[in-house]
Amino acid sequence: KGGKFTITLDQRLATDNHIVIYEDSIAKDGKRKLAARDLEFMDNISVNWIPANIDTEAEGSHNGENYIAYTFYIENKGEETVNYWYTILIDDVIKNVDEAARVMIYFNGQKTIYAKQNAYTNEPENETIPFYSEKEAVLEQRKDFAPGNIDKFTIVIWLEGDDPDCTDNILGGEIKMHMEIREEYKESNE
């Protein structure tokens, strides 16, 4: 099965600090929630099949046949420098499909790939950073976000066919994730 992906901005960060998120760099139509187009089905692929220009090819949803891709911006329209956290939370996993899932983040052009540690060796997968926890794929802090700054994110999610954990056992599986942008990090007690 495919996947669903949304991005939400913490109300306090939006209201108190005048932080906005948007997917169109021209219109800059600020929202509190953004949503990538869903994929009905996602087959496993190699990272090498993802276009090299994925970070610059489009804004908003620009999914491929077997991956979710979404580009958006965060802008500080306030008068104070702030720090913010961004986290990608794993909402639901069916048939252990998270064992082969990859989350690639381009943050202002810098690429990082996150993956669950190998189930057999308990080591990070090749050229990846391990998921932060069982329920959080990514947790990072952006410091010194000054007035007028704009951060660009491109998020890409796929199932890595070259992952040793990508077996027939995950066929028909599903994964749902969402991203939160907030002023303070709060431990999730789920």
Language model region names:
Residues 36, 44, 65-67, 126-127, ...:
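Alpha-helical structural elements
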Residues 1-51, 61, 175, 184-190:
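Short, polar/proline-rich extracytoplasmic segments that appear immediately after membrane translocation
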Residues 42, 104, 177-179:
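Detector for methionine-enriched segments
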Residues 2, 98-100, 172-176:
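Short edge beta-strand segments in beta-sheet-rich domains
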Residues 5-37, 94-135:
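A surface/secretory-pathway sequence property marking extracellular, secreted
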Residues 53-82, 89, 133-190:
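C-terminal, structured domain-capping segment
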Residues 83-97:
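Short acidic, flexible loop segments centered on an aromatic residue
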